């Protein structure tokens, strides 16, 4: 008996070449979509792109899939199987078993339409296990699974999936850009070969997805190493220095153009502190999705970066940060120095891990002795933080005549992450991410008086081993010697008999009697 040939299924985008369209049996493919309506439209055209006798099943998580799935009268199979499932982690793990109870999965094409943001509360470890399980299941039963995932943060989802190439045969995103759509292919593997890092413009007409005419003949760039994409503020008013330079008015436009780059130099501009987190997210997306050949530079045009912010940007994938006080000539020399570099540092797949580096201590001010020790121990154990750069531990002993509780009232830290405690007649401070050479400046900001007038002795620890060793000694202090702040004095606020006339406050006159009735009768 002649063996049957395994079918090859197709993604529902017309004019797309087979290397980016075919989905043979025995694999899992994943497409993120910015909008729910785009996801449904892509599913409908994907069904219409199959042969007449193809076995197709659609699994929906939200509502009745029969209300949104439409069969094309002239294309695709005459009938398909429809299933619903709960939008939960347990439902995902039981999916293979449930399908086996209903159909023989051999040579079937399963399309899973996820609910909006289904994967937000599912950990990356659980996602990895599920993909590994589905990969083995599709290979064993000679079937294919296409996951269509509508989500409002496709960049984050794509970054999490970039490392799943052993379980995923294809990963792409369908991005909505106002008047057009962009099909962003991270990687796609089938019987035609492997394609990666391609971006194609799509047109949607009459619910049909087609490749834009300009993309049908466009050649994907293979070597753009000489290109420099820069914010216009980086050159400080100077024109582009050569034909390789392209200037952009804002970081958003620069980021969108950099999505297609492979080895170019990308130069962002930073002028305000509130730009740091959005810029970090853009850098993380580019580094995770476009690879290690991309050179990413941040030019600080106005002083706005702290040491923790620099670590965040570098940890997200930036090659270099140019300080605000570097002249233009020095800036251009530094840009030239990154040419030909390959980014070699590890970038975590989830940016929230990196964002937690900026404020690992969500504490400020006085903490009980045990809470203080636990907080510093947690920080010392954080492997993502730089070695010997987590902060400074300072123990201060007050001069004779001043109690340590009184000295505590003068300690007024302003930064989150700066904490203190008292015990054993010492005031102990931990200044997160403070460099030891900046300690005196930091103490002058924290205390209103010179520290030499308040304290007679000071001990400092700034290396991780030193701080950890001192923590061991601090934990040996008995609770009876732990200090507590002085109680706040209760002062009754005087009641002011006044009213506001719309411009200023005016006191209300109160009538006073100089003599009471008894005194008047006596006279």
UniProtKB/Swiss-Prot annotation:
Superkingdom field: Bacteria
Keyword tags: Cellulose biosynthesis, Hydrolase, Nucleotide-binding, Protease
Alphabetized Pfam families for the sequence: CBP_BcsE (PF10995)
GO function term, MF aspect, one: cyclic-di-GMP binding
Knockout mutant characteristics: Mutants lack the ability to produce a biofilm.
Any one of the GO BP annotations: proteolysis
Cysteine pairs bridged by disulfides in the record: none
Family that this chain belongs to: Belongs to the BcsE family.
Function: Required for cellulose biosynthesis. May have protease activity, but BcsA is not targeted. Binds bis-(3'-5') cyclic diguanylic acid (c-di-GMP).
Name of the protein: Cyclic di-GMP binding protein BcsE
Native source species: Salmonella typhimurium (strain LT2 / SGSC1412 / ATCC 700720)
Lineage of origin: Bacteria, Pseudomonadati, Pseudomonadota, Gammaproteobacteria, Enterobacterales
Gene: bcsE
């Amino acid at each position: 008996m002649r063996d049957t040939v395994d079918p090859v299924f197709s993604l529902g985008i017309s004019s797309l070449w087979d290397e980016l369209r075919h989905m043979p049996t025995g694999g899992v493919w994943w497409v993120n979509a910015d909008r729910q309506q785009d996801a449904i439209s892509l599913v409908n055209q994907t069904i219409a792109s199959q042969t007449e006798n193809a076995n197709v099943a659609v699994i929906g998580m939200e509502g009745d899939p029969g209300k949104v799935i439409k069969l094309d009268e002239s294309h695709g199979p005459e009938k398909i199987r429809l299933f619903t499932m709960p939008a939960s982690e347990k439902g995902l793990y039981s999916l293979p078993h449930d399908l086996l109870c209903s159909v023989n999965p051999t040579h079937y094409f399963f399309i899973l339409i996820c609910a909006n943001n289904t994967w937000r509360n599912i950990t990356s470890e659980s996602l990895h296990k599920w993909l590994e399980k589905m990969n083995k299941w599709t290979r064993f039963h000679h079937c294919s699974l296409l996951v269509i995932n509508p989500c409002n943060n496709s960049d984050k989802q794509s970054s999490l999936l970039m490392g799943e190439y052993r379980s995923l045969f294809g990963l792409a995103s369908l991005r909505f850009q106002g008047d057009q759509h962009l099909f962003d292919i991270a990687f796609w593997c089938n019987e035609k070969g492997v394609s990666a890092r391609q971006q194609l413009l799509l047109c949607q007409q009459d619910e049909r997805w087609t490749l834009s005419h300009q993309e049908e003949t466009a050649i994907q760039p293979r070597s753009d190493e000489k290109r420099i994409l820069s914010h216009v503020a980086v050159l400080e008013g100077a024109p582009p220095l050569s034909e390789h330079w392209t200037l952009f008015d804002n970081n958003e436009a620069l980021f969108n153009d950099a999505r297609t780059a492979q080895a170019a130099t990308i130069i962002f501009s930073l002028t305000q502190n509130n730009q740091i987190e959005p810029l970090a997210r853009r850098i993380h997306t580019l580094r995770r999705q476009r690879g290690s050949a991309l050179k990413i530079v941040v030019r600080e045009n106005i002083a706005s970066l702290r040491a923790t912010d620099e670590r965040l940007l570098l940890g997200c994938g930036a090659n270099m940060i140019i300080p605000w006080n570097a002249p233009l000539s020095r800036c251009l020399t530094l840009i030239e120095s990154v040419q030909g570099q390959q980014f070699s540092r590890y970038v975590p797949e989830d940016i929230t891990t990196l964002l937690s580096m900026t404020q690992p201590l969500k504490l400020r001010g006085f903490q009980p002795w045990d809470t203080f020790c636990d907080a510093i121990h947690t920080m010392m154990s954080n492997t993502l933080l730089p070695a010997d750069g987590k902060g400074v531990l300072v123990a201060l002993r007050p001069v004779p005549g001043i109690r340590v509780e009184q000295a505590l009232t003068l300690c007024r830290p302003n930064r989150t992450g700066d904490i203190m405690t008292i015990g054993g007649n010492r005031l102990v401070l931990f200044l997160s991410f403070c460099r030891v050479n900046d300690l005196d400046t930091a103490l002058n900001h924290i205390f209103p008086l010179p520290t030499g007038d308040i304290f007679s002795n000071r001990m400092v620890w700034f290396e991780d081993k030193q701080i950890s060793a001192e923590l061991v000694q601090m934990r040996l202090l008995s609770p009876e010697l732990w200090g507590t702040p002085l109680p706040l004095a209760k002062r009754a606020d005087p009641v002011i008999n006044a009213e506001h006339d719309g411009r200023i406050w005016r006191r209300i006159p109160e009538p006073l009697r100089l003599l009471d009735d008894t005194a008047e009768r006596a006279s």
